[in-house]
């Protein structure tokens, strides 16, 4: 496959990129600014770059492919992919964890040196599930501390890092889609209180935006009383990534899971933020069936009401530690 071949040109087990010509992009992850990938002292990373979140995407892809193979009756392929994902997770922890920042490195450079910088990329690692549970919780705790969390959302780079600039495109700004993926990661590790905190921050930010529509990004200044978030002058609005953010935050808060094989929609440890008392979801589809739901908040708990179903479909709440 591409992942295990051209995607890993030096065979170290990590997917990486390297600019092929001088006119190409120096950085080829979602943070593709020229200065987005750097070391703790501010030096730009050079050579083949293995981004932290990309390894998580590979891990998640192999686990999902293993599930597909098992459903298709290809058990040997399923076991192979599952084993590869497990080995990748072990290799990942050894190579990317940086005790000096109590988080995962932003990337490995061409010499396999970790970029020991606190960034939101580590938050996206939680979304993919590759992080060990104890380390995931430590990363999550950092994401909601003042170095990252402004009251409006989570910055792309912590405020005490060398290249931090709250007005930078990728080095200190707040990207709604980035926050949404982090929220899914928080939910994955059972941190629903943190999900609610992040949900409220972005909802509050949206109330200051034109048409209450979250833009591509906005500046990473700290929230102040009687002042809204500082807009990024050339941010796209509307923007596809950002437009999905409210739905993704709701997915994270409710713990929505879709099990097509069982014809079941599950709400895992659902929790609504304090500003949201009730949500009605219409035409929630699973295959050819659909359901309308009402979720009501009662303190830190929720009540679920099935308003209407079409076709064969089950809905359940799963409460787990």
Spell out what each predicted region is.
Residues 49-60, 117-120, 170-181, 237-244:
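Aromatic- and histidine-enriched alpha-helix N-cap/loop-to-helix transition segments
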Residues 43-46, 179-184, 230-234:
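Glycine- and acidic
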Residues 68-95, 99, 186-197, 262, ...:
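Beta-rich accessory regions
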Residues 54-75, 124-135, 179-194, 248-257:
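Well-ordered alpha-helical scaffold segments within catalytic/enzyme domains
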Residues 1-5, 57, 64-67, 80-98, ...:
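Alpha-helical scaffold segments in carbohydrate-active enzymes
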Residues 172-179, 189-198, 206-214:
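Active-site-proximal binding-pocket segments
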Residues 235-280:
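Catalytic cores of secreted or luminal carbohydrate-active enzymes
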Residues 4-50, 90-174, 207-230, 247-248, ...:
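Extended glycan-interaction surfaces of carbohydrate-active proteins
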